[in-house]
């Protein structure tokens, strides 16, 4: 049968998948499977379990959640983590969903005081499955399933130890790794080399998950997350720091003991490998004894790690309580600031209202002046209109009395003046002279007729200022008389 990994690769050959690529590493990539929610943290039950080798409290139990939205876009949410989630160097608000895209930079936790970058930094990418698969980090459930049968400690029999002598040091390394109290990681097989030069290569990687945060003397603790240190400092100023101080002291002591046990176990493993390398059968009892001592050391280390984990959880709980207390203090200070800001805003509001009232009075005075001016203008306009109407009325009287033909009772049309100085319409006097050759007014003989253009022009301009009815009637009259003249 072929390698199961190759079968998985062939089954998804040609596909492209989304993943979080660990910055600067070709391992521990996090696969984002379509349709599945991905959880990341240091606790159990998450999709990918991250155990910080520098600071155990850096990653929260359920640090963040990645899943697809209705449109298939991948999103990330900070699940109220202690040290936060950072997207493109900006911290995300807790419990708020943010979309992520190819090339985005994701950071879990914060850098330590003596580091420029955080321990867990990723880049969102989409790659071919053949490229991603060799670099993927195993899921938590896969690791638990793979190591179900390795939970029980086993002892080597004499025959196994004798047989292992012929197999060489590499086989012994894998057997020693099975003695771990929590064999959650696979031990890589290294070639032959100097055992003393690389003793940590033969340790169970699970034992190295808690890197010491203290020096070998146990007197100085390496800086933890900036947020934790700052919280503890604020707590010292605000209240009694006994709880956090005792937790930190226990943390220091336990880490020192874990470091000492790990050092002893490394030395014991190196000694077993050296003895096994030097002899094949002669020192079997000595090897069994040394491996029994190694088991005892590993058991002690397991117990210390369990205690340390409990203390870490207690310390985290204490820090959270202190953080809540500090938030309460900050809230009270914020309320005082808010009251001051409110009083200042109220004062500004009153000043603004007074200014608006003054402006309102000024505008009312301006409006009253404009209204008065408008009334005056309106009165003057009415006076002018009345005068105009009076002039038009007087002009109508003049037209009716002085510029009307007594024959047709219409305004003169082509006025002519007789030798007696009386004026008539040209058409009317011509018709009159067909019956009598004397003036209709004074009865003098008509000897001459003179056309009066000035009188015609004066009548035409005066008629233009009259109403449309008078204008239309005059136009019709002129047309009728021109038509009669043609006939």
From Swiss-Prot:
Description of post-translational modifications: Autoubiquitinated through 'Lys-48' and 'Lys-63' of ubiquitin. 'Lys-63' polyubiquitination is mediated by UBE2N. 'Lys-29'-type polyubiquitination is also observed, but it doesn't require its own functional RING-type zinc finger.
Catalytic activity: S-ubiquitinyl-[E2 ubiquitin-conjugating enzyme]-L-cysteine + [acceptor protein]-L-lysine = [E2 ubiquitin-conjugating enzyme]-L-cysteine + N(6)-ubiquitinyl-[acceptor protein]-L-lysine
Pathway(s) annotated for this protein in UniProt: Protein modification; protein ubiquitination
Predominant cellular place of this UniProt entry's protein: nucleus
Keyword DNA repair in record: yes
GO annotation (BP), single: epigenetic regulation of gene expression
Gene Ontology terms for molecular function: chromatin binding; histone binding; protein homodimerization activity; ubiquitin binding; ubiquitin protein ligase activity; zinc ion binding
Residue ranges of the region described as Disordered: 143-176, 182-201
SUPFAM superfamilies hit by this protein: RING/U-box, SMAD/FHA domain
PROSITE patterns: FHA_DOMAIN, ZF_RING_1, ZF_RING_2
EC category: transferase
Region (Required for interaction with PIWIL1): 68-72
Subcellular location: Nucleus; Cytoplasm; Midbody; Chromosome, Telomere
Known function: E3 ubiquitin-protein ligase that plays a key role in DNA damage signaling via 2 distinct roles: by mediating the 'Lys-63'-linked ubiquitination of histones H2A and H2AX and promoting the recruitment of DNA repair proteins at double-strand breaks (DSBs) sites, and by catalyzing 'Lys-48'-linked ubiquitination to remove target proteins from DNA damage sites.
Free-text note on domains in this protein's UniProt record: The FHA domain specifically recognizes and binds ATM-phosphorylated MDC1 and phosphorylated HERC2. This domain is also required for proper recruitment to DNA damage sites after UV irradiation, ionizing radiation, or treatment with an alkylating agent.
Name of the protein in its database record: E3 ubiquitin-protein ligase RNF8
The organism of origin for this protein: Bos taurus (Bovine)
């Amino acid at each position: 049968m072929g390698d199961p990994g190759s079968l998985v690769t062939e089954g998804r050959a040609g596909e492209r998948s989304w993943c979080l690529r660990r910055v600067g590493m070709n391992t521990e990539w996090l696969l984002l499977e379509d349709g599945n929610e991905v959880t990341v943290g240091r606790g159990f039950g998450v999709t990918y379990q991250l155990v910080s080798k520098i600071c155990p409290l850096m990653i929260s139990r359920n640090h963040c959640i990645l899943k697809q939205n209705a449109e298939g876009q991948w999103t990330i949410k900070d699940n109220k983590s202690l040290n936060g989630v950072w997207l493109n160097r900006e911290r995300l608000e807790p419990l708020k969903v943010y979309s992520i895209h190819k090339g985005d930079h994701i950071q879990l936790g914060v850098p330590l005081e003596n580091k420029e970058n955080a321990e867990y930094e990723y880049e969102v990418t989409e790659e071919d499955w053949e490229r991603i698969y060799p670099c993927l980090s195993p899921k938590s459930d896969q690791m638990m399933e793979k190591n179900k049968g390795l939970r029980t400690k086993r002892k080597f029999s004499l025959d196994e130890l004798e047989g292992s002598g012929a197999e060489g040091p590499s086989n012994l390394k894998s057997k020693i790794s099975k003695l771990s109290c929590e064999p959650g990681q696979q031990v890589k097989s290294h070639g032959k080399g100097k055992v003393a030069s690389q003793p940590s290569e033969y340790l169970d990687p699970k034992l190295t998950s808690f890197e010491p945060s203290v020096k070998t003397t146990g007197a100085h603790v390496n800086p933890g997350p900036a947020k934790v240190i700052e919280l503890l400092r604020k707590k010292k100023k605000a209240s009694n720091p006994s709880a956090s101080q005792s937790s930190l002291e226990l943390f220091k002591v336990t880490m020192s003991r874990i470091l000492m046990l790990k050092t002893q176990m490394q030395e014991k493993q190196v000694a077993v490998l050296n003895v096994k390398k030097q002899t094949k059968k002669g020192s079997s009892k000595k090897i069994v004894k040394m491996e029994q001592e190694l088991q005892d050391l590993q058991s002690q280390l397991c117990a210390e790690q369990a205690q340390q984990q409990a203390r870490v959880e207690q310390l985290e709980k204490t820090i959270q309580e202190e953080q809540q207390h500090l938030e309460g203090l900050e809230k009270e200070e914020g309320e005082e600031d808010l009251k001051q800001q409110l009083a200042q805003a109220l004062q500004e509001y009153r000043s603004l209202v007074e200014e608006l009232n003054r402006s309102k009075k000024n505008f009312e005075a301006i409006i009253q002046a404009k209204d008065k001016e408008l009334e005056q203008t309106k009165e003057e306009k009415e006076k002018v209109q009345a005068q105009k109407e009076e002039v038009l009325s007087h002009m109508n009287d003049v037209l009716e009395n002085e510029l009307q033909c007594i024959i047709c009772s219409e305004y003169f049309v082509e006025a002519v003046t007789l030798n007696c100085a009386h004026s008539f319409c040209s058409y009317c006097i011509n018709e009159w002279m067909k019956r009598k050759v004397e003036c209709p007014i004074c009865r003098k003989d008509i000897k001459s007729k003179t056309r009066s253009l000035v009188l015609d022009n004066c009548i035409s301009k005066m008629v233009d200022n009259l109403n449309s009815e008078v204008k239309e009637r005059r136009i019709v009259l002129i047309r009728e008389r021109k038509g009669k003249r043609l006939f």
